[in-house]
Amino acid sequence: DWVYAKDTYDAFSKQHPELLPPGITDPQIALFETPLGEIVRLFSFILKGDARGAMNCVKILTRIDDVRELVEQKSPQAKYLYKRFKEVNREYQSLLKSGCAAAKKQDSLLLFSYTDDTISLTSDLSNELLHRFPDKTIIVCREKSGEMKCSLRSATLLLPPLVQQSLAGLEGYGGGHEHACGSVVKTHNFDEFIRRIRKQI
């Protein structure tokens, strides 16, 4: 589901080459291997957590005049947003390290789960894990309130039918794009859900 819009890339790179070096045509490279990627994660991470805190960050974000103000933390507003970003990023980097460690060389499925009642990072984690392990099917799950909330990614498999077939008869639901899906399944059905997915990949 990565999109490369050449005109947009070229215009942004021309204006901000320090964030997006010229010549990059792969959206994954732009997102995970350039300074621009940190800005993208900042936008994602400041919206995590409770709604009041997220809306406060959005309000502050409207007072930022230029991306350089944000990157260089030139104002109190930019410093506040970066402080919030760093708080979430510490947790993200710790989970990412654990997710990478969960990858097994001979296993085509990278399954990683964690427990957190406050912040959902499954989508962000599954995207980066797919970038790092493009030959694997990625499933990142967060356990909360008796459910496993999952983000699934694959560079090659069509995920919606795979998810629907794996959920048949179980307490859960899911769907999404061709190569990026979400699903929620009760914890007591989770092992069976994963067993069915393994049979299809």
Predicted regions and their residues:
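A structured phosphate/pyrophosphate-recognition subdomain
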Residues: 1-105, 115-116, 132
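Glycine-rich, acidic loop segments that terminate in or are immediately followed by a histidine
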Residues: 11-18, 108-201
